[in-house]
């Protein structure tokens, strides 16, 4: 949806500290971290590479088509991630902290004063994913089908930023 550019605007224009939940979760899935330890407890050593790191490709294939496995992963990783985000916010000296997370959940409301949703028309999202990540159209559609629908996000959000247009248009909405 073009979230990266929106995050850059908050950081560059408003001096915000940006915390990306996906990066926090990845750090928690490194060797010796509680996320990886928990995943191994749930799924066994078969999810590890020879060097002890998570075999992300194999693990993703294992859980992507298995809703129950994905639910178990989320129930482990999400609370760990939000606890780490809360710690980073407490220790931040920035006046504004922006947390980027793919999903809104109970923890989002507990941690964040406002929830913003960056929305983009589906076809523009597909074009951006194909250009920026090299995905096929089919993979983009599959990813989008597995995400909560736009209506859910817009109802939960305090503010919606339409990022279908230019960077300048998004900037005006942020101000």
Language-model features: locations:
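ATP-binding Walker
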Residues: 1
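Small-molecule kinase domains that catalyze NTP-dependent phosphoryl transfer to phosphate-bearing small molecules
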Residues: 84-85, 93, 110-111, 131, ...
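ATP-dependent NMP and nucleoside kinases share a basic, alpha-helical "lid"
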Residues: 83-91, 96-132
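ATP-dependent small-molecule kinase phosphotransfer cores
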Residues: 26-93
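Residue-level signal for inorganic ion chemistry
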Residues: 22, 73, 98, 105, ...
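Walker A/P-loop
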Residues: 4
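Short beta-strand-centered segment that lines the nucleotide-binding/catalytic pocket of NTP-utilizing
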Residues: 16-30
């Amino acid at each position: 949806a073009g979230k990266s550019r929106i995050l850059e605007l908050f950081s560059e224009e408003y001096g915000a500290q940006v915390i990306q939940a996906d990066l926090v979760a990845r750090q928690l899935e490194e060797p010796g971290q509680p996320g990886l330890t928990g995943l191994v407890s749930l799924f066994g050593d078969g999810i590890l590479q020879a060097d002890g790191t998570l075999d992300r490709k194999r693990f993703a294939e294992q859980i992507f088509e298995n809703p129950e496995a994905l639910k178990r992963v989320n129930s482990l990783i999400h609370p760990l991630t939000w606890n780490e985000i809360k710690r980073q916010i407490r220790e931040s000296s920035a006046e504004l902290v922006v947390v980027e997370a793919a999903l809104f959940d109970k923890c989002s409301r507990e941690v964040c004063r406002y929830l913003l949703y960056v929305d983009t028309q589906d076809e523009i999202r597909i074009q951006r994913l194909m250009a920026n990540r090299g995905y096929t159209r089919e993979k983009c559609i599959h990813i989008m089908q597995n995400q909560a629908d736009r209506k859910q996000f817009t109802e939960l959000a305090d503010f919606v930023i339409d990022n279908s247009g230019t960077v300048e248009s998004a900037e005006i909405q942020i101000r």
